[in-house]
């Protein structure tokens, strides 16, 4: 009797030229045999001493390496099945289930409250108000400080210009003073031994210096 695979849809038969091995159901080990029967998933299938499963339905770790993958391990169970036997259509027919009642037109109060909570802004509690006010004060203070800093920078720039002008005037006054000293010295030498001498200075030797406030 030619060995063939008992798996549903599998057409493998023993052929010495094909690298496919066949393994009989472990009838002497009922617990393991039931696992094989459950894995096959064939209705009303009872294996006999001639029933077998081909090696294509076992994963590589189910075989013993020392036996060139020809013998199964003691606890090996077939798990690869591409086809399964279709179920009886009568069993697939399910009893009509009761239809759930239609949803009410008016949503529950809890849903209405939740929707209102999403649409309405949160109530301004004292804590929220204080945080909001503090935030506004912080923004206003920052803007005021920036404006004040800008004003101070402008004032500093003006004072720098005034200081530069005053320094220039001071240098001019120093030069005029040096000229005045030279004139006085010259006049003294000219008068010689006279007890009192008079010096007539030109008008351009004097300049009114305005000190910035």
Curated annotation (Swiss-Prot):
Residues 139-190 form a coiled coil. Signal peptide: none annotated. A motif (HCFC1-binding motif (HBM)) lies at residues 134-137. GO terms for cellular component: nucleus; PML body. SMART domains: DM3, THAP. One of its GO terms (biological process) is endothelial cell proliferation. Its main location: nucleus. Keywords: Cell cycle, Coiled coil, DNA-binding, Metal-binding, Nucleus, Transcription, Transcription regulation, Zinc, Zinc-finger. GO terms for molecular function: DNA-binding transcription factor activity; protein homodimerization activity; RNA polymerase II cis-regulatory region sequence-specific DNA binding; sequence-specific DNA binding; zinc ion binding. It is found in: Nucleus, Nucleoplasm; Nucleus, PML body. It comes from the Eukaryota. A zinc finger (THAP-type) spans 5-57. InterPro entries: THAP1/10 (IPR026516), THAP_Znf (IPR006612), THAP_Znf_sf (IPR038441). DNA-binding transcription regulator that regulates endothelial cell proliferation and G1/S cell-cycle progression. Specifically binds the 5'-[AT]NTNN[GT]GGCA[AGT]-3' core DNA sequence and acts by modulating expression of pRB-E2F cell-cycle target genes, including RRM1. May also have pro-apoptotic activity by potentiating both serum-withdrawal and TNF-induced apoptosis. Interacts with PAWR. Component of a THAP1/THAP3-HCFC1-OGT complex that contains, either THAP1 or THAP3, HCFC1 and OGT. Interacts with OGT. Interacts (via the HBM) with HCFC1 (via the Kelch-repeat domain); the interaction recruits HCFC1 to the RRM1 promoter. Belongs to the THAP1 family. This is THAP domain-containing protein 1. It comes from Bos taurus (Bovine). The gene is THAP1.
